[in-house]
Swiss-Prot record:
This is RING-type E3 ubiquitin-protein ligase PPIL2. Pathway: Protein modification; protein ubiquitination. Keywords: Acetylation, Coiled coil, Isopeptide bond, mRNA processing, mRNA splicing, Nucleus, Phosphoprotein, Spliceosome, Transferase, Ubl conjugation, Ubl conjugation pathway. Residues 35-108 form the U-box domain. It comes from Homo sapiens. Residues 456-520 are annotated as: Disordered. Component of the minor spliceosome, which splices U12-type introns. Within this complex, interacts with PRPF8/PRP8, EFTUD2/SNU114 and PLRG1. Interacts with isoform 2 of BSG. Interacts (via the PPIase cyclophilin-type domain) with CRNKL1; they may form a trimeric complex with HSP90. One of its GO terms (molecular function) is ubiquitin protein ligase activity.
Length: 520
């Protein structure tokens, strides 16, 4: 290996390397910019034509595309020159049995390499070989199909394989300048998403039709666009933190500018649960007897409110206990009786409320059944014995305080060993709510707000009235020192003794040099 082999290696890309190896502008290659337009395509839409017409120069267009262009621009789309619609010539292409364009005389199929011409007077299209042999060389200038006379100048070249400049799409005037004709019907159709679905099967179309019928996206969007209603903040529901709108408007230009801090409003349920201090009591009337339940409303307020509200709306009336396991639990609260149904009072599952001082210890513990974390609805179960392993899995919200003999009778009913369903129906006929702490909490909150409304005007009146002695000090003149009494300053000056007459001046002792050490 030679020395200094990496001496010319750079830690950066040089200009020459970037130009030749890693990027940079490449030299233009004219042949790569050539885009060939087939002879059977419209020079404006660049799509196969249906009603072909041509200009005196032999540029082919589709009648449905060129007419709107001429109405708007009045120019030739390929070169930008003025063009009159009356100068367009209708072309009559012939097709063979396979549906391909061909010469009606020689029956040669037209390709992109065929020399194609048309007669101006009739619009018939032929291969150049047929016109050259039968018209030009024979000096018989009559149409080969209709026998109509024409001149040498009436022969229009539509395609010459040796001169393809007019078929170069890259040189078209409307392509270079990005000029288009906007069809109102097409623009309206583009607003429908199905416009962009070209190939769909029957199943997809049926699914889309069903989606369009049930789609409520516009309603949801309109609901989200509405400004949320501001909660009324008072002394009871005012949080110790602000809404954060001031800082948000300061850091984001998308927010509406805010300059005043507003206290955030505490959720109404959180406020109500602070006033719930009592237990709730409910009785279940079953076909086996009555069960008296005590609800821990002060510990699990959300779960207990759900149970009490469902009992008050008679949600559990007529439901059965669909699952019973001896020495374990009995479960109910499902209107369908299958163990998979039921809804909460609010129509959606709510969160678990685990408390360390509540455990599945003992007989008659009332707890919520669920299908996983935070999936509580309406189903509940009552334990027949201690089940401590269910702690922190199911929310305990009450216990049985009366009717243990009824609970024993329920346990003695035999169940199907495969499905755990009682062979004899155990049904809840009705429910009775004796104590509802939430009504008392609502009444207490309403009373607190009434007293606040009464106290607020009185405090405003007191604050508006000036208090005794709260007036400003007396002014004696304008400007600096306007509160100073001139008489007080004069009296103080007269009573002040003269220091020059009473205090004697102390005499300085002359210094006598070093002296001796007697004073040391």
């Amino acid at each position: 290996m030679g020395k200094r082999q990496h001496q010319k290696d750079k830690m950066y890309i040089t200009c020459a390397e970037y130009t030749h190896f890693y990027g940079g502008k490449k030299p233009d290659l004219p042949q790569t910019n050539f885009r060939r337009l087939p002879f059977d395509h419209c020079s404006l839409s660049l799509q196969p034509f249906v009603y072909p017409v041509c200009t005196p120069d032999g540029i082919v267009f589709d009648l449905l595309n060129i007419v709107p262009w001429l109405k708007k621009y009045g120019t030739n789309p390929s070169n930008g020159e003025k063009l009159d619609g009356r100068s367009l010539i209708k072309l009559n292409f012939s097709k063979n049995s396979e549906g391909k364009y061909h010469c009606p005389v020689l029956f040669t199929v037209f390709t992109n390499n065929t020399h194609i011409v048309a007669v101006r007077t009739t619009g018939n299209v032929y291969a150049y070989e047929a016109v050259e042999q039968l018209n030009i060389k024979a000096k018989n200038f009559r149409d080969l199909l209709t026998d109509e006379p024409f001149s040498r100048q009436d022969i229009i070249t539509l395609q010459d394989p040796t001169n393809l400049d007019k078929f170069n799409v890259s040189n078209f005037y409307h392509v270079k300048n990005n000029m288009k004709i906007i069809d109102p019907d097409e623009e309206k159709a583009k607003q429908d998403p199905s416009y962009y679905l070209k190939n769909t099967n029957a199943e997809t179309r049926e699914t889309l039709q069903e989606l369009y019928k049930e789609f409520k996206g516009d309603e949801i969007l309109a609901a989200t666009m509405k400004a949320p209603e501001k909660k009324k903040v008072d002394k009871l529901n005012a949080a110790h933190y602000s809404t954060g709108k001031v800082s948000a408007s300061f850091t984001s230009t998308a927010m509406v500018p805010e300059t005043t801090h507003e206290a955030a409003a505490i959720d109404e349920d959180v406020l109500r649960y602070q006033f719930v201090k009592k237990k709730g009591y409910v009785r279940l009337h079953t076909n086996k007897g009555d069960l008296n339940l005590e609800l821990h409303c002060d510990l699990t307020p959300k779960t207990c409110e759900n149970f009490i509200r469902l009992c008050k709306k008679h949600y559990y009336d007529g439901t059965i206990f669909h699952r019973s396991i001896r020495n374990f639990v009995i479960q109910g609260g499902d209107p369908t009786g299958t163990g998979t149904g039921g809804e909460s009072y609010w129509g959606k599952p709510f969160k678990d409320e685990f408390r360390p001082n509540l455990s599945h210890t003992g007989r008659g513990i009332l707890s919520m059944a669920n299908s996983g974390p935070n999936s509580n609805r309406s189903q509940f179960f009552i334990t027949f014995r201690s089940c401590a392993y269910l702690d922190k899995k199911h929310t305990i919200f009450g216990r049985v305080v009366g009717g243990f003999d009824v609970l024993t009778a329920m346990e003695n009913v035999e169940s199907d060993p495969k499905t755990d369903r009682p062979k004899e129906e155990i049904r809840i006929d009705a429910t009775t709510v004796f104590v509802d702490p939430y009504e008392e909490a609502d009444a207490q909150i309403a009373q607190e707000r009434k007293t606040q409304l009464k106290v607020a005007p009185e405090t405003k009146v007191k604050s508006s009235q000036p208090q005794a002695g709260s007036q400003g000090p007396q002014t004696f003149r304008q400007g600096v020192g306007k509160y100073i009494n001139p008489a007080a300053t004069k009296r103080a000056a007269e009573e002040e003794p003269s220091t020059s007459a009473t205090v004697p001046m102390s005499k300085k002792k002359p210094s006598r040099g070093f002296g001796d050490f007697s004073s040391w």
